[in-house]
Amino acid sequence: MSTGNFWDLNVWGLIILVGTLLASMLLANLLKKSIGFLRKSLIPTSVLGGIILLAIASVYKLITGEIFFNLAIFGGNGVETLEILTYHGLGIGFIAQTMKPAARRFDKKRNGEILDTGLTTVSGYLIQAIFGLAITIGFSFLVANLIPAAGTILCFGYGQGTGQALNYGNIYEQDFGFVGGRNFGLTVAALGFLSASIGGVIYLNYLQRKGKIKVSEEEITKAINMEEVQGKDEIPMNGSMDKLSVQVAIVLAVYAVSFGIMFGLGSAVPGLRSIMFGFNFLIGVLVATLLKNILRLLKRKNIVKKEYVNGFLMNRISGFAFDMMIVAGIAAIQIDLIAQYWYTLLILGVVGAIITFIYIKIVCKHLFKGYEHEQFFMMYGMLTGTASTGMILLREVDAEYTSPAADNLVYQNLPAIVFGFPMMLVATFAPKNGLTSTLIALGICVAYFIALNILLFRRQIFKKKQKVEAQSTEEVVSE
């Protein structure tokens, strides 16, 4: 054996590391069920599991001076493996989400609300980036090694979660000399989850005291419809190849093709390699969308007889991938590497939470009448954590998901990706020439934010304009 004996630690390192991550989530779940304030905090189990491991690793480092996850029992390079798991969790999770069959069609009004949700998502990224850049531009004159463009990580850590925060932190660290960039990104994402959990609970309690909402006291378990697991014309659950194995194979095949595209483009243009591999989830989404359309066409022409993709199982794959991404990302944080940035990080975290809260509150009040609070909790949770956090907060005010907010979250991904893509390009441009390019990026974000909000509030803006023109016409006629 080239790897040594089966009892050697390097054979078991990855298994023990993954087992530790999963065990931390089991412990976190037990603590949430047993401790009242944790149960009421709405903190996701994966986040709590990551915090438990971060605390253990930090205490170990304080006592021994060594990195806990780099012990031989974890293979000797556990921190690097945690970052790899975080990176791949993002791509695999998005591919599985994209492969899910579309569940329903909507009328014109609902399509407009879904578009508005996507526009709100991207506008949320932009306002986070604007305030984040303003903060880090100022602190870059005071804090050593802090680059002015670091503030863009706020919109990725809060708006898109651990995976993208790590991606851009890594790009800034490797390509632009941002010392501790990866840990900076992971910490911003962790602060986002805390903002979602703590801020969400505070506002929930406030609205409940005012009598504006009714919070569900009991955890509701929704019965699984067997048609979700074994739909019409789908391949059998236990055929010659297990149905779950088929779903995993599809997801990983899409991811492999995505790697080929990233590798090819990165080899053709070496300067874009880090950017290409930072877009692993986006390229995965595009390849998955293409495959989904090909399968739909083949099924329509009766070339493929059965449905191979199952939405229920794809949900389970994406849920597992995102759980692993979150717990691994938080556990990978090395606090000593970001000690010099703590004041900056705390200010970014607090300002990010406040400005996201205010902006989403305004949008939901004016654009989502009839389910303002449901839409708010879904959007606030998503724009400070992930889609899963948004669903957790939404469940507190809409336990059965009867409002349109849950569908808005699911179907807003396409407009969010389309309108959000320029933001990713701006984020890679921002650090190129230090303060100058960062200021240009800030100006672009402000201009794009204004443009998107004109589009978002198009009905209100043009309705008022038409009303004013009508009044002017009436005055002229009366004269």
Residue positions per predicted region:
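Hydrophobic transmembrane alpha-helices of secondary-active transporters
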Residues: 24, 51-58, 80-110, 287-296, ...
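C-terminal transmembrane helix pair
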Residues: 325-329, 333-335, 345, 349-460
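Structural signature of hydrophobic alpha-helical transmembrane segments
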Residues: 9-23, 79-93, 150-155, 277-287, ...
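Alpha-helical membrane segments and immediately flanking helix-loop junctions
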Residues: 123-127, 135, 143-178, 184, ...
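Intrinsically disordered, low-complexity non-transmembrane regions of multi-pass membrane transporters
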Residues: 1-11, 18, 206-245, 296-308, ...
